[in-house]
């Protein structure tokens, strides 16, 4: 595809229809998940590990230890535990995220025009990204929780998504499907806002290299690493909230209490369990997702323009 078709479809003022955003976002989410699924499983397992200062002889948990233990006790297929709800999650999340971002970006641009407001591009991207993160979380959260519960299962026999869903409803009610949604909302909204903000900054700084292959992916990699690096503790808190009832046998109550429990028992570093794997997973995921989104829109437009009328 020639360079003239590779414009930034996420920048302020970009004319992308809701249908284009919906389709390209769905594809980008599905592709990103399919490629990075094993890293996501390892990251979640690390985040769900608990360790107390009162037991200093406890073996240090590393990504390598998690992989060895997982392969030994559960088999290779365990690297894809929770993949069905995760694929649904990523496809839906990508669709809602990019569609909402595009719509909010247009609304913000119109508001700036109507009220003669001059908003920095970085603030524009940040606000639209935060809104996109909130909308995506509200839409897909039950699938995120199901994915976490399935990955947390360390038995060799895989749990079914429907069985886990019924178990949550029976033991915790509808509210159980939204356990931990408040820290999740803060985590995802801030991560998404920072991702779009840093992506647009990276695109601006790399404008003279726009003909470099995969430049969108490179900027997406930077955006993913930046956003996750800042908000990772909130992601850990979200995961702990999601499995609270499974671990302690009681309904999830307070994210603040869980946060204080992590810090008191494991120290501040407990909030960063799985950080290295998370960056290794999130940065490529953002790179693939953003590049795929940009490419799908460019490719579909190029196809429509080159397709002869009948």
From Swiss-Prot:
It is found in: Mitochondrion inner membrane. Solcar repeats lie at residues 16-107, 120-205, 211-299. Its main location: mitochondrion. Pfam families: Mito_carr (PF00153). One of its GO terms (biological process) is mitochondrial thiamine pyrophosphate transmembrane transport. Mitochondrial transporter that mediates uptake of thiamine pyrophosphate (ThPP) into mitochondria. PANTHER family: SOLUTE CARRIER FAMILY 25. This is Mitochondrial thiamine pyrophosphate carrier 1.
């Amino acid at each position: 595809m020639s360079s003239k078709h590779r414009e930034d479809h996420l920048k302020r003022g970009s004319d992308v229809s809701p249908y284009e955003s919906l389709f390209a976002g769905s594809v980008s989410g599905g592709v990103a998940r399919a490629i990075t699924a094993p890293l996501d499983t390892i990251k979640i397992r690390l985040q769900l590990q608990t360790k107390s200062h009162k037991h200093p002889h406890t073996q240090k948990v590393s990504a390598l230890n998690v992989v060895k233990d997982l392969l030994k006790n559960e088999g290779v297929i365990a690297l894809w535990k929770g993949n069905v709800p995760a694929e649904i999650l990523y496809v839906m999340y990508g669709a809602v995220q990019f569609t909402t971002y595009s719509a909010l970006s247009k609304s913000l641009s119109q508001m700036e025009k109507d009220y003669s407001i001059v908003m920095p591009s970085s603030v524009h991207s940040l606000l639209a990204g935060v809104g996109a993160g909130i909308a995506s979380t509200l839409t897909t959260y039950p699938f995120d929780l199901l994915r976490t519960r399935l990955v947390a299962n360390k038995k060799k026999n895989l749990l079914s998504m429907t069985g886990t869903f019924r178990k949550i409803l029976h033991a915790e009610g509808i509210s159980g499907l939204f356990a931990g949604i408040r820290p999740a909302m803060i985590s995802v909204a801030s991560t998404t806002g920072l991702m779009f903000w840093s992506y647009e900054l990276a695109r601006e700084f790399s404008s003279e290299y726009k003909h470099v292959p995969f430049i969108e992916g490179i900027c997406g990699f930077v955006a993913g690493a930046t956003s996750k690096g800042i908000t990772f503790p909130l992601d850990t808190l979200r995961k702990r909230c999601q499995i609270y009832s499974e671990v302690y046998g009681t309904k999830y109550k307070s994210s603040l209490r869980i946060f204080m429990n992590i810090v008191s028992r494991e120290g501040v570093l407990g909030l960063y369990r799985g950080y290295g794997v998370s960056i290794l997973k999130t940065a490529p995921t953002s790179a693939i997702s953003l590049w795929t989104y940009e490419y799908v829109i460019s490719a579909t437009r190029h196809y429509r323009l080159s397709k002869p009328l009948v």
